[in-house]
């Protein structure tokens, strides 16, 4: 004969429920500072390591619900109505890098946005939501909502190289009420690259910058030939011409048939040493001989 499973029936007490609700209300009275909407709660590098995982819960919230009794934690919920994932790369837009992302509730195994792929060579913000509440006790036991993914890069990117920064931003609310919303499609907003401003706005600034390191002590303003002379110069061509005052010459008169000459001084050049012309084949620089 098969044995029927034994189960202990739940029994309720109105007084116990009233007392528990009062305890929950008192516990949540200090959550005003926590429920302040969106906050940038984290920042961590995107690395070429294959996978990453981050828990979407702040230390402040964990510390807050850690003070609750087990009964109170079982009646308190944590909501993440809005989740943003911002990314800014340090790699160039010509470097191949892709990430595949998803959200997962570890307590229930539910997943959202699985298969979402983004290029990690561009800056963007992803907008998501988790349309249901999380039990505070599950969050306290590290079984809350997690954002994770895998990263794959080009073979030229070294392993464990930091290729950018992740900035997860989410809303976090501790409440006695439960969130019940429809699931929205993931939305991506891509940033447009900015432009480099003008660094030098005039020739004067550029000239001053260049002159701070470039020498102009020996320089011509326009293009000049560095040497203007013959291709070959004799070292013995220069000499001083003398005058021989002992020689006279008679210049003939116009009507004199005999051709009488008047003697006068005559310029006589000094004997020159005949120069030897070198052939082009045998020529060499005398200054370096």
Curated annotation (Swiss-Prot):
Coiled coil: none annotated. Signal peptide: none annotated. GO terms for biological process: transport of virus in host, cell to cell. The keyword Transport applies. One of its GO terms (cellular component) is host cell plasmodesma. Keywords: Host cell junction, Transport, Viral movement protein. The keyword rRNA processing does not apply. It is found in: Host cell junction, Host plasmodesma. Belongs to the ilarvirus movement protein family. Transports viral genome to neighboring plant cells directly through plasmosdesmata, without any budding. The movement protein allows efficient cell to cell propagation, by bypassing the host cell wall barrier. Acts by forming a tubular structure at the host plasmodesmata, enlarging it enough to allow free passage of virion capsids. This is Movement protein. The lineage of its organism: Viruses, Riboviria, Orthornavirae, Kitrinoviricota, Alsuviricetes.
